[in-house]
């Protein structure tokens, strides 16, 4: 397990115990953490009866309260807590924490715009506490598992996944604003890895490009990246400025979403890419 400077005054067991997210004293938290994990990667599409829903909803709220408190700590303590959960075999809960790390609690917001604004603020404030530990074994395990199967995860996780995508062929599908908060990871059935090994070589990301950029995702270039990739944002820029892209996707079902997003991005290149650049006219003209 990765070594972290000891924080002798911090008691992980006592801290985690405040939130009723592990153990079996009153509810089976091990089962609920697995259920929550399945719900997240399926965009919360699970079937429960009324009693089960009440218990599940309580557990969700407990996890949110844990995250809300944990992410205010420094990185050392955050990963001490995650390692404590790993020592208790709560790996599903760890993945839930990573996936919900920057998410606001929907119950606290009346409008989608306010929710998205809070999400962006959380990404700016908290996401670096995970990306700064990109090579940690728990982050690596989450990323390799997420990239090995078809699932949906919140878009702030893109900056984590990107580090572990060396040697992978990437395709993009383009979603409208109704499906913008998550990235859909699509792995062909013959590519899915039964043992979560690093064997997946092809993956499709379903995203809303403009929303990803608006949220500040894709700006990180990792100095420790063995593949020496630039940022995911740079990948998007190369993608949308290539005429070859249009040839490849012009007959796809999501081409209209791609077109509208590119035209909108072209009005805000300084905001999204930090450069006073424009998408080539040759590309724009082929979109019209």
From Swiss-Prot:
Domain of life of the native organism: Viruses
Protein name in UniProt: Uncharacterized protein L234
Organism for this UniProt entry: Acanthamoeba polyphaga mimivirus (APMV)
